[in-house]
Amino acid sequence: MPLRLDIKRKLTARSDRVKSVDLHPTEPWMLASLYNGSVCVWNHETQTLVKTFEVCDLPVRAAKFVARKNWVVTGADDMQIRVFNYNTLERVHMFEAHSDYIRCIAVHPTQPFILTSSDDMLIKLWDWDKKWSCSQVFEGHTHYVMQIVINPKDNNQFASASLDRTIKVWQLGSSSPNFTLEGHEKGVNCIDYYSGGDKPYLISGADDRLVKIWDYQNKTCVQTLEGHAQNVSCASFHPELPIIITGSEDGTVRIWHSSTYRLESTLNYGMERVWCVASLRGSNNVALGYDEGSIIVKLGREEPAMSMDANGKIIWAKHSEVQQANLKAMGDTEIKDGERLPLAVKDMGSCEIYPQTIQHNPNGRFVVVCGDGEYIIYTAMALRNKSFGSAQEFAWAHDSSEYAIRESNSIVKIFKNFKEKKSFKPDFGAESIYGGFLLGVRSVNGLAFYDWENTELIRRIEIQPKHIFWSDSGELVCIATEESFFILKYLSEKVLAAQETHEGVTEDGIEDAFEVLGEIQEIVKTGLWVGDCFIYTSSVNRLNYYVGGEIVTIAHLDRTMYLLGYIPKDNRLYLGDKELNIVSYSLLVSVLEYQTAVMRRDFSMADKVLPTIPKEQRTRVAHFLEKQGFKQQALTVSTDPEHRFELALQLGELKIAYQLAVEAESEQKWKQLAELAISKCQFSLAQECLHHAQDYGGLLLLATASGNASMVNKLAEGAERDGKNNVAFMSYFLQGKLDACLELLIRTGRLPEAAFLARTYLPSQVSRVVKLWRENLSKVNQKAAESLADPTEYENLFPGLKEAFVVEEWVKETHADLWPAKQYPLVTPNEERNVMEEAKGFQPSRPTAQQEPDGKPASSPVIMASQTTHKEEKSLLELEVDLDNLELEDIDTTDINLDEDILDD
């Protein structure tokens, strides 16, 4: 069966002809040197051009990253080597390296060396620590030296390919080649070493359209690959996958199996001739250079072949080698979240196939290895072969002795105890299968669940799943798609009833088989269930768990990680990365058990589990309870004062909220509590809260609404003392203390407003205020100050002023007493009164003047409501206003509105 290899294009960068490509080891960058003399750096994640180097006007045939120095090294047809800092774009160094075009650059992985090859038939070694001096020259080729590559298993050895039809292997320190490989009929364009430890192989591609595999220890050609229709310009062993990549001037890239030499795939992106290829250890990305630009493709899946059983034994594949590690062997080693675990690795042997996936069965006794279209079931302890076969896919059932294979796109077979039990053809074909409590089969029509025992259709769902995860109880299942995931409840009792009675069974299965609990718009990469909690890694590298509609983030991961399993006794979750590093994160089983009990409404169990939850975790549990609607329990459980205060407000628990507000000493909390107290008619508590919050506006509202005159008076004094002039003014004004209002405006420099207030209510004070206004204004504008008219000097401009003096005195003598608030309905509103008419015939007991004889300002009268009563409404005097927790005070009933502009500070 063919190697299952997903190929996805990640980047297409249109440009001039690309002569070389390279991938950065840590950044998501591709380096491309162009025939027009430029070098470009592309970000293949954002698909943007991030850097450009204008090297020269001639073709740049070679360019490499030197990541440890932040360099880009280029070689061009002007025979110059140039070194650029890719962060600053500064040219660090430049020198003439050869006497003809420079074809290739190879960077030593550990030493400060680069090797260059040229059309001058020479290879040179340069040392950048010695001011880029030429340390050695390698002579021997009789034509252009097209490519050089350093042996990854022996960094002192390198190989070269030349148009003289030979491949030569060299040693640093020796100017002559170790040996020469001959076999191509035309010039050799490219060469590469196999990086695995099991084969001493070289690969070469030539103008004879052939690709040859060489054993450089035996110096023999072990395989010739035919298929390209034009010159082979690039050939490479992939450092991670068991594949060979070759590119040709025929415009195709061919992918071959490196063990069977079978052609697996042919890529043609229509960008004319292929010139170069680059890959990187630890990555599945491959860069390709063409006449019309460059492309990055992702080959295969980066998820490692790795599995862990319930006891903490981890098995993984490193290429074809299977290794094991045991978490128990760590003993009492201190483990920190997110740090790599220091595991002792044990080699278990080699696998006959290249493993793409490894998976334990539910009880952990067996492990299946899948790859190359085959599967092998081994014993987990000793890796002894138990069963094998051809299959495109494999899935374990919840019963550890049962499994299914997808033999083709139309046939699924079920095995029990390693013997075939049943074979069937799903109605709409089988593109993929999924294990668990039910056998899932994906087809073009959607997802179908079948019974393992009799392959009866349980339910067909119109969905295209990527992963399916079943809980241990079989009650819950997560179906993950490309864009979101669904949580479903499997109703096994209804399924059994429907199977017996055949009621509710349609062509799409049993209608009531599943109940949808929720859909979450997040992409699941890997996942597992612990109780009723679904733990998963997301596409944005977050480690989350979902329970009861709530998503809790356990950790933000710094790279892509894959879930292995959860060990309850350790209270830890284990994950692995593509480099086979194992990390873990703390996740308390008591928290998960509590949340599971709440979801099942088993509160007696939840109460038993609660004491085992550490205090630092209880707030997380309280948030969960709140989201489930159990706010009273959340208030009891939570240890976070902020959270408890919010819950107390929501529940109307005034005492608890008051205690928390006292402890917090927060103005915001006092304001929130005051609002709650008012809504509960607890006005004395509201008053105390507003005082703590220094909310003078709220206090004024409360005082006026309750008719509390003494409170208004105290508020006026306090507000003025604290600089809350608007509230102070309004408080004085409501009490009829117009003198205090006037003096407040004068003290705060609001002299125009003071003048208008005096003209309206205190005409006896107008002259004094105008003089103050004039003095103040003269400091800014003398002419404007002189234009102000004093009403006592220009009576003709202020008609009715003399009468106003009389009215002011009349009001003072006749309206000195306050009226009870309960008589408000009997008082004629100010807007309906004519004070001038009421004061007719009044003779003041003293002359109306601007000032008293001693020179002090005359005391201001207070304008009060009319004392006229109507006999027919006498019974209304008995009216009482019944307000809980309030004591009505005598207040001024003067209903006077003040222009808002006057109130602005």
Curated annotation (Swiss-Prot):
GO biological process: intra-Golgi vesicle-mediated transport; intracellular protein transport; retrograde vesicle-mediated transport, Golgi to endoplasmic reticulum
Pfam families in UniProt: B-prop_COPA_B_2nd, TPR_COPA_B, WD40
Protein's UniProt keywords contain Transport: yes
The keyword Zinc is assigned to this record: no
Positions bearing N6-acetyllysine: 627
Phosphoserine PTM positions: 859
Compartments where found: Cytoplasm, Cytosol; Golgi apparatus membrane; Cytoplasmic vesicle, COPI-coated vesicle membrane
Molecular functions (GO terms): structural molecule activity
Cited Gene3D superfamilies: 1.25.40.470, YVTN repeat-like/Quinoprotein amine dehydrogenase (2.130.10.10)
Region (Disordered) location: 837-873
Disruption phenotype: The knockout of the gene results in early embryonic lethality with no viable embryos recovered at 12.5 dpc.
Membrane protein topology class: Peripheral membrane protein
Any coiled-coil regions, as ranges: 867-891
Lineage top rank: taxon: Eukaryota
Entry-linked PANTHER family: COATOMER (PTHR19876), COATOMER SUBUNIT BETA (PTHR19876:SF2)
Quaternary structure, from the entry: Oligomeric complex that consists of at least the alpha, beta, beta', gamma, delta, epsilon and zeta subunits. Probably interacts with PEX11A. Interacts with SCYL1. Interacts with JAGN1.
Membership in a protein family: Belongs to the WD repeat COPB2 family.
Function according to Swiss-Prot or TrEMBL: The coatomer is a cytosolic protein complex that binds to dilysine motifs and reversibly associates with Golgi non-clathrin-coated vesicles, which further mediate biosynthetic protein transport from the ER, via the Golgi up to the trans Golgi network. Coatomer complex is required for budding from Golgi membranes, and is essential for the retrograde Golgi-to-ER transport of dilysine-tagged proteins.
Name this polypeptide is given: Coatomer subunit beta'
Protein's organism: Mus musculus
